[in-house]
Amino acid sequence: MIEPLLFGIVLGLIPVTLTGLFVAAYLQYRRGNQFGL
């Protein structure tokens, strides 16, 4: 059995991690376009 608190933390971190990766990829993509690469 997984503790509810630990389960809640994992469920909370997953969307934050996915959002962080998406934002980082978007910023890197946009920055590359600004330099014409």
Curated annotation (Swiss-Prot):
Family: Belongs to the PetG family.
Protein localization: Plastid, Chloroplast thylakoid membrane
Provenance organism: Guillardia theta
Function: Component of the cytochrome b6-f complex, which mediates electron transfer between photosystem II (PSII) and photosystem I (PSI), cyclic electron flow around PSI, and state transitions. PetG is required for either the stability or assembly of the cytochrome b6-f complex.
UniProt keywords, alphabetically: Chloroplast, Electron transport, Membrane, Photosynthesis, Plastid, Thylakoid, Transmembrane, Transmembrane helix, Transport
Membrane topology: Single-pass membrane protein
GO molecular function list: electron transporter, transferring electrons within cytochrome b6/f complex of photosystem II activity
Protein name: Cytochrome b6-f complex subunit 5
Pfam families, per the entry: PetG
Transmembrane segments: 5-25
